[in-house]
Amino acid sequence: MAQGGLSGQEYGLHSPHSREFERIPPMGKKEELIVGLDLGTTKVCTVVGEVTTEGLDIVGVGTYPSAGLRGGVVVNIDQTVNSIKKAVEEAELMAGCDISSVFAGVAGTHVQSLNSHGVIAIKSREVTQSDVTRVLDAAKTIALPFDRQILHVLPQQYIVDDQDGIHHPIGMAGVRLEAKVHIITAMTSAVQNIVKCCERAQLQVQDVVLESLASSGAVLDSDEKQLGVALIDIGGGTSEIAVFQNNAIRHSTVVGLGGNHITSDISVGLRCAMDEAEKIKKKYGCALAEAVNQQEVIEVGSVGGQKPRQLAQSILTQIIEARTKEILDIIEWELVRSGFIESLHAGVVLTGGVSLLPGIRELAERVFDMPVRIGVPCNFGGLGDVVKNPIYSTAAGLLLYGKDHGGGLPMRDSRGRLGSIFETFKRWWREFW
């Protein structure tokens, strides 16, 4: 299988615990649109994709600084709604359409996962779709606190009469069907607040999707998932981990550390404002102290109206390397705890905004003692080159999830597309370059 989303069956089903919102069914098949909405700690990103016979064409991208979110969780409804509206408006301008529904990502340390299994008797001695549905229902029958809900039930394998390793059991003969699954749960209130913010921004939520699951569809290929790979999505407020082996997700967790913690350390260490620290990190940052010229000097803005100061770049790099290594060490501990670190024969794939930090791949290879690559969304048509950046991994992956789940909606042109693409692309180019 080429790079792209998981199949609908691999993504799994929601449970009765997640009925706080209803999925919006697809509307028509002509010129279909899918929209992914990534609600991050540092940015809100909207990506619009058009379903084609070849796959997906990117037709619109919008980003806006995130306000009202912390660690992937909504902490201010009004600010979050405003960020969503701005990102959606920019994507609409580029795509030349009106956006009415989205696939929204969810993240945060409130997300938890576990492995489960279910067993049923096969009524007709041949596995049917009804049997598969029943065994998944049995597997997701778990005790949950009242304030949590199931987001995903992800099949790992099916077993028919002790024959294991089956991924597509329909049509097979047998009397006993077993399913081993990976279940992802989240705080109900956190999911409800995401849905509420989208609705206040005049958007219907077609589904809420774990962000690392979405990212995996955009940046991992089938060979990596088969051999064993860890996807590590390091964003502004959290670092998300998803481990795949034998083409199924085996472990997932979220670490409450990300790029903002690096920025905070820079702010304290260099005695400058957070905004200044973020600019310095992006302009001069490096995750390996040995990789920078020890004689190089940078200018640092001061607080309280004082004059800017000059400091050795090596001081900045030492601060960044220390915090980045701490984040990677914690992630390695999570991989050891999962029991799969020795099975990652395809290594580690880093994505998310922090993966753009120079030197982080080399540092990660030292920490994990295995090959590491930077994952970017690939195999998109249209404006696909625009999203070939780790910051778009989640939003692009949400498009693939939506495509696999028949989430296309008919496109309504609201303005001339070529002109709007040109104007928005110029804004995007100025912002990121």
Where are these regions (language model features)?
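Glycine-rich beta-strand-to-loop/alpha-helix junction loops that act as flexible
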Residues: A104-T109, A346-L356
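Short glycine/threonine-rich loop-to-helix capping motif typified by GTGT followed
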Residues: D221-D223, G353-V367
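A structural feature that tracks compact, well-ordered secondary-structure segments
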Residues: E240-A242
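Nucleotide/phosphate-binding catalytic cleft detector across ATP-hydrolyzing
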Residues: A2-K43, V47-L231, A248-R250, G259, ...
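A cytosolic small-molecule/anion-sensing beta-strand core signal
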Residues: Q245
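Hydrophobic, well-ordered secondary-structure elements that form the walls
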Residues: I331, L350, L398
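A general structural motif
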Residues: I234, R323-E332
